Amino acid sequence: MAFWVGVSTAADTNCAHEQISIYYKTKHKAKFCVELAINNEERQRGLMFRKEMELSDGMMFVYDRPQSVSFWMKNTSIPLDIIFADEAGKITKIFENARPFSTTSIFGGYDVKYVLEINAGLTKSLGIKPGGLIKHSIILPGN
């Protein structure tokens, strides 16, 4: 799945995964090329054991229903920004600069259906904030 960040057009043309867009600041859009983590095994492994990640890449965790979620950075060597979103794809919380290998729990909220992990610093540099909207075909309008 791809998610355009505005930092590179590589996500648009060379994406081997899925493409996703985030709309923020009214008319601004960022795209990223992201892997989807849909089942329990994929969600548990996440980005663990990865040594690097392209600037416009990421991973989106998809849950069957809105729920309480917490993340940690165990075995994850890439510093990340973690974006939590509700059933409609609306960004409800952002945790910036999650520390590699930390086992400290990062609570995302109670009604989270989607979690997007991107390279640390991108939410701040792009101005992505709670209230923004994640768009992808898996996120149905009106949810």
Give the residues covered by each predicted segment.
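Compact, glycine-rich, soluble single-domain proteins
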Residues: 11-143
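Bacterial N-terminal signal peptides
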Residues: 1-6
